[in-house]
């Protein structure tokens, strides 16, 4: 056969990014990644976005991923460049955002010697990434990048970190980038166990007070349309988590509100009184459950989730189903029937009438007025938030529909997220209006952007 011309690891990395369909990366150069920056400079298919701080870079990549469905790609240097990613990796890990982050590393013979700008970034981030690895041999580079994109995108999405020693990257090797992935220990299940699903749907039909709980998994799987159809057919009311907001349009007559400590009275009462809680794509985080033994005390619980580890971790469930939310909901749509929920819906309407979401305004104009005006003005906006009071106003009052997306730090609650997230969302969606809503504190945390 013909002998392929060898290329450096830096060249292979750029080739790999193109093969993976990457058109934008968020990068901040430094000594250990300068050769990669040079390779990126020599081509024009991939745009490189330069922030002022690596934390802002990873938040921007995160929102880019959330709003486009692509993988967010980061490139930072070793040492402080890498450690500045930590909060952003944890944010993405909690909220299931696919990222591939490349960190520079000192040459192999210096690793472990406390060399200049050397940290064990794989060790530091082990608990906040889906996978992390140092490329110790040039011949492993292509395979590792291929696996990283596969791991980030599939199953429950998440951030992957690849640490690149400088000498490995300058070494010559094969120009080939693998076409397939063969990971023995990682086989994410997506298809639905039909026996379990039919059992769950039978329970749904029998229930007197059924309730859907939709989490961020419905939005991540982009199953909103199918889920809304299921809700329309069954006539079963819906509550959502903050990350699940928009699983059905927030102006839908069967949408009660968010549950949890920052949720609506009626939504929390519905969870307490329902006899079947049919939950899709949620982790049952402490913000929504309160005391675990008092959560949905009268209900049988169905839990559909892509992540085996999320099922029965916090709440004991009666019917566990490990599946991709979009596949599960599409199958449900084929089999569901209308449920008799008239009395149950009247009870919920009564709670809503007695305890609506209200807000005292001191002076002439309050946060709610601003958000409601925004609802009227913008049809297709992406709304990003920081974390705190203003975030709760947005998650309670902002209209989220098929055309309006909410981008917020849910699991970790990262102040400083909203502004760089808006930049990342706009880069991914140049034709859409992007609105960042921030508090005075969060705004100052990444104000350098």
Q: How would you name each of these model-derived features?
A:
Residues 3-4, 139, 175, 202, ...:
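Phosphate/pyrophosphate-binding active-site segments
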Residues 10-13, 18-22, 36-40, 349-431:
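Active-site diphosphate/adenylate-binding microenvironment
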Residues 102, 110-111, 116-117, 312-314, ...:
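Thiamine diphosphate
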Residues 23-24, 66-77, 82-103, 126-179, ...:
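Structural signature of the thiamine diphosphate
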């Amino acid at each position: 056969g013909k002998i392929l011309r060898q290329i450096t690891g830096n060249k292979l990395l750029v080739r790999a990014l193109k093969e993976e369909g990457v058109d934008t990366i968020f990068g901040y150069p430094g000594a250990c990644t300068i050769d990669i920056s040079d390779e990126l400079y020599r081509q024009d298919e991939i745009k490189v976005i330069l922030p002022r701080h690596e934390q802002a870079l990873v938040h921007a990549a995160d929102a880019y991923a959330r709003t486009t469905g692509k993988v967010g790609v980061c490139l930072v240097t070793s040492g402080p460049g890498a450690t500045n990613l930590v909060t952003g990796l944890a944010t993405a890990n909690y909220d299931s955002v696919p990222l591939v982050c490349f960190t520079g590393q000192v040459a192999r013979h210096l690793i472990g010697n406390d060399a200049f700008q050397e940290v064990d970034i794989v060790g530091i981030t082990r608990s906040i990434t889906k996978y992390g690895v140092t490329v110790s041999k040039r011949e492993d580079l292509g395979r590792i990048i291929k696996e990283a994109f596969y791991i980030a995108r599939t199953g429950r999405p998440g951030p992957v970190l690849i640490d690149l020693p400088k000498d490995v990257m300058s070494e010559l090797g094969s120009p080939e980038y693998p076409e397939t992935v063969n990971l023995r220990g990682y086989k994410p299940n997506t298809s639905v166990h039909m026996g379990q699903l039919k059992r769950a749907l039978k329970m749904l039909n029998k229930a007197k007070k059924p309730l859907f709980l939709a989490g961020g998994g419905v939005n991540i799987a982009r199953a909103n349309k199918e889920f809304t159809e299921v809700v329309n057919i069954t006539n079963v009311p819906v509550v959502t988590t903050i990350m699940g907001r928009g699983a059905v349009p927030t102006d839908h007559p069967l949408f009660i509100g968010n549950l949890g400590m920052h949720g609506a009275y009626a939504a929390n009462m519905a969870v307490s009184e329902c006899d079947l809680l049919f939950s899709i794509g949620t982790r049952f985080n402490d913000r929504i459950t309160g005391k675990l033994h008092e959560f949905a005390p009268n209900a049988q619980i169905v839990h559909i989730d892509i992540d085996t580890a999320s099922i029965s971790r916090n709440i004991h469930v009666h019917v566990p189903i490990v599946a991709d939310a979009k596949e599960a909901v599409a199958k449900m749509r084929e089999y569901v029937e209308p449920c008799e929920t008239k009395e149950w819906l009247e009870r919920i309407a009564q709670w809503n009438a007695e305890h609506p979401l209200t807000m005292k305004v001191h002076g002439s104009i309050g946060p709610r007025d601003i958000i409601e005006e925004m609802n009227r003005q913008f049809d297709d906006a992406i709304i990003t938030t920081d974390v705190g009071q203003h975030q709760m106003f947005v998650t309670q009052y902002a209209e989220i529909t098929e055309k309006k997306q909410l981008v917020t730090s849910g699991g970790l609650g990262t102040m400083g997220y909203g502004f760089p997230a808006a930049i990342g969302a706009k880069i991914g969606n140049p034709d859409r209006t992007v609105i960042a809503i921030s508090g005075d504190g969060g705004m100052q945390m990444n104000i350098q952007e």
